[in-house]
C-alpha cells in the first residue's frame, strides 16, 4: 500500500515501501514456506506485512483505496462539467482542500480502470454503503439538522486523527 499519484519507473523512489503495508493474499493450498519467503522479501523492502483472504482484502481496499480514487475522479469531473463561468472560478479558487482531495485523480487512468473492473463486486458494495451515508448527510443538510452533521463530523474527525496517529496517512 504505497506510491503516489505518479506512475512509471521515473516516479519511483528508494523508500517507497518503507513503513507501508504489503498485504499478501495467498489462495487456499498455497505452500506456507512460499508465503513466509514472500513476507520476508517485502519486509526487506521496508514493508509491514499482513496476510488476508482475497475476498476480505478486496472489501478492505475497496473502501480504503478504490472508493477514494473513484470519488476524486468524480469530483474533478463534476467541477469540469459546470457552466463555463463557474468552471473558471472553480479553477481560480481551488484551494488546498480541493487540491488535497483530488490529488489522486492524477493517478494512472488505465490502472484504475482495471482495478475497478477487477474488483467490481467489492467496489459496488462499498459504493452502495457510501451512497447511503452520503444520502443521510444530504438529508441532514436539507432539513437543517446541525446536530447530526456535527456528530458525524466530530466522529469522523477522531477517526481521521487515529489514522494519522497510526502513521498510515
Regions inferred by a protein language model and the residue ranges of each:
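Internal alpha-helical scaffold of NAD(P)-dependent oxidoreductase catalytic cores
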Residues: 16-103
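Interdomain hinge/lid region at the active-site interface
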Residues: 87-155
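Residue-level detector of flexible, active-site-proximal loop/helix-junction positions
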Residues: 1-2, 56, 108
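Long, positively charged, glycine-interspersed low-complexity recognition regions
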Residues: 158-169
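Short, flexible, solvent-exposed loop/turn segments with mixed acidic/basic and small polar residues
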Residues: 10-16, 114
